[in-house]
Amino acid sequence: MKKTLSLCLLALVGCQSNDAQMPQEIAVQSGGELPDNKQYANLHISEAVYDVEKEAAFLLLAEAQQQALIWQQYCGSEDLTEDSLKSAWHSTMLRWMALQGQERGPENALKESWNMQFWPDKKNTTGRKMSTLVKADKAWSANDLSQMSVTVQGLGSMEWLLYDKASPIHKDKIKACDSGLAISLNIADKSDNIADAWQANPWKTLDEKKWRTEYLNLLSNQLEYSMKKMSRPLAKVGKPRPYFAESWRSETSLSNLKANVEAMKALYIAHGFGLDKELRDRGRIQLADSIVEQFDLTLDTWPEESSMFAMLKSKEGYRNVLAQFNKLEHLKYLIHEEVAIELGVVVGFNATDGD
């Protein structure tokens, strides 16, 4: 898959019909039946959760490929504008949210996390490294970037190129393409590695007790990461740090976080065979309902404003962001305390490390 895409882009030929399949097509090609047709009751206890993660990986791949192809078209003709590039980047970013913050799963997928996105960026390392990169008189390749700092490889560097005032994209299209095409291809390559790593279920050998530990920690890790994306810019009351927000340049931090919450809810439900069903089967219907209701409340009251950076500039905006953080904190309590006690699970224990 990766070689086909790389050759396509480097040759600047129109191969969109071959490689830029719709997300569902790529998910089907990943192998097996679609989840709705599966009889999960007859499969390993982890299978439904595995399908959620595998689907997320292949949906990310589809968007990353599409982004690379749009960059190819942008650089090879006058048919597309920067708005098309921004839309493709944002779509890829939203798909990445479903896998962001993971500490459980295939090793080859987890090790690509920093390559996909460098965050938090406390010292604006991305800005400094990208400024140096685009000043070089060179058309970069994905291979070049893969040997360099993670700050110029992934989604954060693409955001800088598309939105930062110092980016050449505002006045020199050729210079922007010298790095943008390579970054897009590198993101597609890393996404391909992630999707490939999720081709096999990494949890099939776990017994029920170890699987419950792994599952709860998988969900917990992503929840804590999402909370960190809010707590860092919120900082101290009255003294926010808006530049610590994840996507402050594009002003899409809150859109990203909403996608995080939606992905966590999907992980919790897992096609009707996830943690929600486990709790109901144990007679903990009220607890299961409380978690679903907390997810729904969080999503239903999510701010319409996509920019945390903008909201933190006012007291009312700060209060609204803090209110959403508190909802996630309550969700954390339900999972870390109530669910963990019910399942006899220690949050933070890695079930794959052995007894």
Language-model features: where?
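Sec-dependent signal peptide recognition
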Residues: 1-7
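C-terminal motif of bacterial Sec signal peptides marking the signal peptidase cleavage site
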Residues: 12-14
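Bacterial signal peptide processing site
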Residues: 16-19
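Mature extracytoplasmic or organellar-lumen-exposed domains after removal of signal/transit peptides
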Residues: 22-355
